[in-house]
Amino acid sequence: MKLFLSLILSTFLYAEFGQIHNGFGIDIGSSGSGIFITRQATHESEKFSLNGELRFYDIKASDETIIYNYYSGQYQSVGGKSLMMLPFLFGANYYPFVGQIENNFSPFITARVGGVLSLDGKETGTFRERWKSPDTQISPGGFFGIGIDFKLVGQSSVSVMVGLEVLPMNKKIDGMDDYSGRLIHISFNRRSK
């Protein structure tokens, strides 16, 4: 039975999802910012697509600021955290207005879920000392929001999404157990050959 269901599911996925897009971009969120890579498979009806993405976040402290050190002549960050998160998310986009809008943009609703690998380094010392043996944990995560695909020449597109990033932690990291918040997600995509 499992083999039969696997065969049906794989046939459904590969037969109906012919357009594959690869992309990269930036994320700007309540807890920090980062970069990501993504892969999207669009259904032949163009009503929905499946997504997978890997993100890299640099988490900022709420009181972190940059100052100028007159002694060294360098700018430096004060009050920062040595915390990185690597969310790996899978989900779908739903395009409710396919065939109803004549221009080259497509609004959508999106939901993604997955895991978040958190790396918590020491707060002081050199770069090597801070990241020599970081505390790690894997916790659930997700993203829910809305967005628009702007289709460009040459089968490329720019996607802009806004929504809620859900990043609860299994245990406290740097005094917090939840790094959830608003997120702006900008992606530059190109159809794979």
Q: Residue locations for each model-derived region?
A:
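Outer-membrane beta-barrel "beta-signal"
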Residues: 89, 178-193
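Short loop/turn motifs that connect adjacent beta-strands in outer-membrane beta-barrel proteins
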Residues: 16-21, 42-48, 97-106, 152-158, ...
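Short sequence motifs at beta-strands and strand-loop junctions characteristic
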Residues: 27-31, 80-85, 101, 134-141, ...
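Transmembrane beta-strands of outer-membrane beta-barrel pores
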Residues: 26-32, 54-60, 96, 113-119, ...
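Sec-dependent N-terminal signal peptides
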Residues: 2-13
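Gram-negative (and chloroplast) outer-membrane scaffold detector with strong preference
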Residues: 42-127
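Extracellular loop and loop/strand-boundary signature of outer-membrane beta-barrel proteins
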Residues: 21-25, 73-80, 128-134, 170-176
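Membrane-embedded beta-strand positions of outer-membrane beta-barrel proteins
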Residues: 22-28, 37, 50-54, 90-92, ...
